[in-house]
């Protein structure tokens, strides 16, 4: 009789826009030799799928009707993962402004969140690694509330604005800050990602550089899991 596969250790990472969730989570996964799952990519991919077909992403019924045919796949290698809808590689396309503009509306639909949460759990279970770093907005409270390690990664708003504007050539800190505030305000209607839930450890990177932040996250993992 075949023994059931041991489920991976899960590091769940939440946080506001511009907190460095994606870059820090990928780096931590790489150093730990774990898989990595960017849950936000699924919402972006669904937004792309709706917009690409000329449908209205602001109409919840339209978005819900798109779910059965939404053939989504994502890799879990932190260094080389790609995002596909059907056979089309949309890794870059889902970062386009037209997609970013509709993501919050897509993510506010309860049926979408429920469907994608089920998908995320399937991906986590089949990751094939000893552990997986899962990052997003509601990972510590909804997707993986029982994760062995749960972290809220945050930083002061001014720091988040400056970091994001440095990533986006030609965008002022003020413009980026306004975009971050709007996105956080829209997403906070659905889930509280600004405050750590019970049992969630806060890592504040306001005074830390990138490498120090990754070190801090790994230190939490080592303390909680003894890896």
From Swiss-Prot:
Report the sequence similarity comment from the record.
Answer: Belongs to the cytidylate kinase family. Type 1 subfamily.
- Origin organism is Leifsonia xyli subsp. xyli (strain CTCB07)
The identity of this protein, by name, is Cytidylate kinase
Task: Give binding positions for ATP.
Answer: 15-23
Quote the InterPro entries the UniProt record gives: Cytidylate_kin, Cytidylate_kinase_dom, P-loop_NTPase
Identify the enzyme class.
Answer: transferase
For this chain, one GO molecular function annotation is:
CMP kinase activity
Q: Provide one Gene Ontology cellular component.
A: cytoplasm
Listed EC numbers: 2.7.4.25
Q: Which UniProt keywords apply?
A: ATP-binding, Cytoplasm, Kinase, Nucleotide-binding, Transferase
Q: What Gene3D superfamilies has UniProt attached to this entry?
A: P-loop containing nucleotide triphosphate hydrolases
């Amino acid at each position: 009789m075949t023994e059931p596969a041991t489920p991976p250790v899960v590091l769940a990472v939440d946080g506001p826009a511009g907190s460095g969730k994606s870059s820090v989570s990928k780096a931590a996964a790489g150093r730990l030799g774990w898989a990595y799952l960017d849950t936000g990519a699924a919402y972006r991919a669904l937004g792309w799928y709706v917009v690409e077909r000329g449908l209205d992403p602001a109409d919840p019924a339209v978005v819900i009707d798109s779910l059965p045919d939404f053939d989504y796949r994502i890799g879990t290698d932190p260094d080389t993962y790609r995002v596909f809808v059907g056979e089309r590689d949309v890794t870059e396309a889902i970062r386009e402004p037209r997609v970013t503009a509709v993501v919050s509306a897509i993510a506010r639909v309860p049926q979408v969140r429920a469907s994608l949460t089920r998908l995320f759990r399937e991906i986590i279970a089949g990751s094939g690694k000893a552990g997986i770093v899962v990052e997003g907005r509601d990972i510590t409270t909804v997707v993986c509330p029982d994760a062995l390690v749960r972290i809220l990664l945050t930083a002061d708003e001014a720091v988040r604005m400056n970091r994001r504007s440095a990533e986006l050539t030609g965008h002022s800190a003020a413009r980026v800050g306004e975009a971050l505030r709007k996105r956080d305000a829209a997403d906070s209607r659905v889930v509280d990602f600004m405050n750590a839930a019970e049992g969630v450890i806060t890592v504040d990177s306001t005074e830390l550089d990138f490498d120090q932040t990754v070190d801090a996250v790994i230190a939490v993992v080592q303390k909680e899991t003894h890896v």
